[in-house]
Amino acid sequence: DIGGGTTDVATISLGGIVSSRSIRMAGDKIDESIIYYVRKNYNLLIGERTAEQLKMDVASASVEFAKELDSQTIRGRDLVTGLPKTIEIKAEDVATAIQEVVEEIITAIKETLEETSPEIAADVIDHGIVLTGGGAQLRHLPEVIAEATKV
């Protein structure tokens, strides 16, 4: 469950939790990462709403897949002049901005799977992983997780 504030990962069998973990890397952290990246690389201050819009419009869990996506025009305040400024940002840059968060989520999934018994791990291979929450809508996240976990 990739929510706003936390990502909760669990292996569930027969209605009970076999192994789980919760990390404070989720949708809000993705937004913060975008804000920081734009500030650092473009000298542009953007707000949370703009970061969330970028996340929904062009963000991808994969830098490679993001190369195929369109760029986005955003507005903010130029940190050098203090004046309003409009820039074009590539989807690839947004994907780069959020890679640390994506990798933390993948690490949590892998660690949870590593704590799972062989029988339940076999069930996970057969039935797959279920992604829920708003953060699960991040483009290419299922493919990136499948590649990292081989599930």
Regions found by a protein language model. Name each.
Residues 16-18, 122-127, 149-151:
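Short, surface-exposed connector motifs at secondary-structure boundaries
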Residues 1-17, 66, 139:
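Gly/Thr-rich phosphate-binding beta-strand-loop-beta motif of the actin/hexokinase/Hsp70
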Residues 14-99:
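Phosphate-binding glycine-rich/basic clefts of nucleotide- and phosphate-handling proteins
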Residues 1, 34, 109, 131:
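Residue-level signature of catalytic and energy-coupling elements of molecular machines
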Residues 121-145:
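Glycine-rich phosphate-binding loops at beta-strand->alpha-helix junctions
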Residues 1-2, 11-13, 74-78, 133:
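Flexible glycine-/small-residue-rich
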